[in-house]
Amino acid sequence: MQGAVYTPEMPPRLLTTAVLVFLCASSPSFAQSTANPGPPTVADAQAFIDRANADLLELSTAASHAEWVAETDITDDTEATTAVLNEQATSRTLALTAESHRFDNLAMPADLKRQIMLLQVTAPAAPKDPKLLAEQSELAAQLTGMYGKGKFCPGTPSGQDPAPGADCLGIDAISTIMSRSRDPEELTRLWVGWHSIGAPMREKYARFIELQNIGARELGYHDTGELWRAGYDMTPAQFSAEMEHAWQQLEPLYRELHTYVRARLIAKYGKAADRPDGMIPAQLLGNMWAQEWGNIYDIVAPTDPQLSQFKPLDLEAALKHQIAEKDPAAAPAFTPGTDLTSDKGHAASLAAGRAMVHYGENFFKSLGFAPLPATFWQRSQFVHPRDREVVCHASAWDVDSVEDLRVKMCIEVNADYFTTVHHELGHDFYFRAYDNKPFLFRNGANDGFHEAIGDSIALSITPAYLNTLGLADSEPPAAADVPLQLRTALDKVAFLPFALALDKWRWQVFSGEIKPADYNKAWWQLREKYQGVAPPVDRTEADFDPGAKNHVPTNVPYARYFLARLYQFQFYKAMCDASGYKGPLNRCSFYNSKAAGEKLNQMLQAGQSQPWQQTLKQMTGTDHLDAQPMLDYFAPLYAWLKQQNAAAAQQ
């Protein structure tokens, strides 16, 4: 649907509660009851849905504008405004959902029935009581703001406000340092410093969960987790089982990767990495949440001379060189010592950010998609503004369901953002493909689809593709596949257990299986069980480490990212097949294939108008989540990891 969609490591929302629902806050037609004393008819149901779609579309535009302002100018005032709008919006959506149940037992065309069902399962988990609803809306705004304004001030004692002018670091700056530092003590300080932002959220979050569950029960669900899992054209229990089955398929590959990486970290750091319980210290993996490990490739790269001769392309250097060469105005952004807050420095950063986005747009254009509208370039946020606080987590926006597509990012020129740009544009091209559908069908087939589109494109960022762009001098031989695959797996495979653990923790919090008194203990039990990672220092219930991950305080479901990591390989294989590619899956790029683009566009245009199983089958030939394409992709690496680990075990 309309609104914002966020990327994994910088986050999500397919139509958040705030956006879905401000929708109805002041709609004239919804202000009037459609109650009818007689039995409902199909004509009544159609009239209801027609009104709902029209009003939701009109009001969604206003909501999207409000949400955009709140996230691109974080102040107490924008927080307060968002809280009020959320409260009004949620109240009206709950009323609309309640009205829709009038048609529950009515026989009607499948298309109409599906729209009513989607309205019901996307209802926000919010209490009907106005006072409780107001409290929930205020808490939601506070938690989002606490994360968005989070800082680590190295010279400030824990629990104290920083002095004026103190040198404080936001999550982007911290993440950059963590990606590059190889000092275990520095990494521990940064990890502990950022995770300290969670503790003040703890009580607010516990109350927020209580209020959400009240709303979920009023909608007929046991808890909010069950409500979240109900939106997948299967029962909540079936959805949980589908995810668990996929993890069981993938776990052997992950365990081999974990074993290999742990051994290399011990070789690098010694006792700092060698825990007797076999866990990897989370701060050593190059990412604040240990969710993606690609930043430590230099530590774990193959040492076999036959493989070590193949060095991963320094894409960051290649991008900076090419961008500066094509647009000299961007060059100062890459010059050491440039003040990026100056007019010249900021203009250079903006030019570099726009150039990064053009790479992604050009890939979609090569598949036959139309260029992005002029307003996209005028209204998007590509870099961090100089004059205000913003939420830097990358997100894609469909503000008016016509042509007002945007992204909100704080782009840096590096390999990670190169991939993130492709990911976010996948959302925007998806938005545009289904914008001719009724409002309630304007969504991905499920939320995992939305996250997977751009990433399936990014899998085509192969050495051959980079060579085509002039970012690589030549295409490496097949012997180079293992190093390249290892670099990819450090992100894509390592991410899966983190995504699973995060939402399993949250589902158990919603269900009451995890009590507030055990929030942090349970968090680390799940992280250890699925990821095999542990915190760098002892943690207690005075801490709230889940709050240091954006998706928890902003209440964004995370299962979509687990799904997306698998769907992207299913989509990728389907488009490779459509392009006529023959050869190892991991070496395919369907850049410039109009046949692949047509297959992709057909899937995007369906939106949520049919069960995702049907859309998936039309795209891939199978109607279920399938890890096999991912396993096929990483087959060379899996064989090599098993060989390496077996040899190490014999030493």
Question: Model-found features: residue ranges?
Answer:
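Bacterial N-terminal signal peptides
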Residues: 16-27
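Active-site-proximal, well-structured secondary-structure segments within enzyme catalytic domains
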Residues: 166-172, 207-408, 477-478, 482-488, ...
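Short pre-active-site segment immediately N-terminal to the catalytic Zn-binding motif
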Residues: 405-421
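Post-HEXXH active-site segment of zinc metalloproteases
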Residues: 431-456
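Charge-rich, acidic-biased intrinsically disordered regions
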Residues: 70-88, 104-125, 155-182, 217-238, ...
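N-terminal helix-rich structural modules
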Residues: 32-207, 225, 549, 553-559, ...
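C-terminal, non-catalytic "cap/extension" segments appended to globular domains
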Residues: 37-44, 78, 117, 223, ...
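Bacterial N-terminal signal peptides that target proteins for export
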Residues: 4-16
